[in-house]
Amino acid sequence: MTEIKAVKRLGQHFLRDEGIITQLLAAIDPKPQQKILEIGPGLGALTLPVLERCHELYAVELDHRVLQPLSEKAAAVGILHLIERDILNIHFAEVAPAPIRIIGNLPYNLSSPILFHCVAQRSDIVDMHFMLQKEVVDRITAPVDTPAYGRLSVMIQLYCQVEALFDVPPEAFAPPPKVNSAVVRLIPQTQLTWNIESIAHFECVVRSAFSQRRKMLRKSLAAYFEPKELMALDVDPTARAETIDGASFARLANALYLKEKNL
C-alpha cells in the first residue's frame, strides 16, 4: 500500500504493532456470518485480519486517500463495504444489517461524541471494541469515588457493561501519540442499569453535578433541590459528585422528573 501519512486534524494514529493487532483480534474474536462495522479502518491494520475471519466487513472512513488502496488490498481477502462518510452522521442500520458488532481505533479528538453516538443506537449493537486514549478508558470504567469517576463513567455505565481489556503503548502507532492508549469492551444492556423515568432528567442532573465536581451537591444542584430534599432522597447535601453512585443519580433524576411533572 502506498505510504499515506496521518492527518493531525483527523486525529489519525495508524496502528502498526503486530502483537497488539493479534491481542485485539483475539478480544474481538470475529466469526463468519457476524455483521461487523469498523469505524476508521485507516490503512487496514485491523481491517484485513478481521475480514479474513468474518469474510464480509463494513467500514466507515472519512479519509478519501485510504479508500482505493484499502479496497484493492481487501479484494483478495473478502468483501469489504467501504462507506465514505462521517460516522457521526450515520445511522448504523442504514449501512449494515443489525444486529452489528462495532470495532475501531477511534480518533482521540472525537472519542466521546462517537461513544455517545453509538450508545444512542445500542438496540442495533451486540458489542463494541474500541481503542481509545487510556485516560478515556479509565473514565469509562471507573467505579464511584475514584479520581477518574465522572460524567462519562455514569452515562456509559447506564447503558453498557464495561471492561478495560489491555493497555497499548504509544510506539504501537505511527505516528506515536503523546499518551498511552487502551482497549475497552462495551456490551449494551437490554435494560438500563438503573431505573430511570426520564433520560433527559438523568443527563441533566449528572451534567450539573459534574460540571462543578469540586462543589458540594447543595451548591451544584441548587437549581433543582433544596438540601432537605437531597436528604429526603438519601443523598448527603455536603457530598461531591464523585462520591455519588449511579443509583443515587437515578433517584435524584426521578425526583426531579416528578417534581417538574407536577408543577
From Swiss-Prot:
Binding site for S-adenosyl-L-methionine: H13, L15, G40, E61, D86, N105
Record CDD domains: AdoMet_MTases
Pfam family, one: RrnaAD
HAMAP family in UniProt: 16SrRNA_methyltr_A
Any GO MF annotation of the entry: RNA binding
Hydrolase recorded as keyword: no
Alphabetically ordered keywords of this record: Cytoplasm, Methyltransferase, RNA-binding, rRNA processing, S-adenosyl-L-methionine, Transferase
Function comment: Specifically dimethylates two adjacent adenosines (A1518 and A1519) in the loop of a conserved hairpin near the 3'-end of 16S rRNA in the 30S particle. May play a critical role in biogenesis of 30S subunits.
EC number of this enzyme: 2.1.1.182
Enzyme's top EC category: transferase
Keyword Transferase: yes
Superkingdom of the organism of origin: Bacteria
Record GO cellular component, one term: cytosol
Organism the protein comes from: Dichelobacter nodosus (strain VCS1703A)
Similarity comment: family membership: Belongs to the class I-like SAM-binding methyltransferase superfamily. rRNA adenine N(6)-methyltransferase family. RsmA subfamily.
Reactions that this protein is recorded to catalyse: adenosine(1518)/adenosine(1519) in 16S rRNA + 4 S-adenosyl-L-methionine = N(6)-dimethyladenosine(1518)/N(6)-dimethyladenosine(1519) in 16S rRNA + 4 S-adenosyl-L-homocysteine + 4 H(+)
Name of the protein in question: Ribosomal RNA small subunit methyltransferase A
Compartments, record wording: Cytoplasm
Organismal lineage: Bacteria, Pseudomonadati, Pseudomonadota, Gammaproteobacteria, Cardiobacteriales
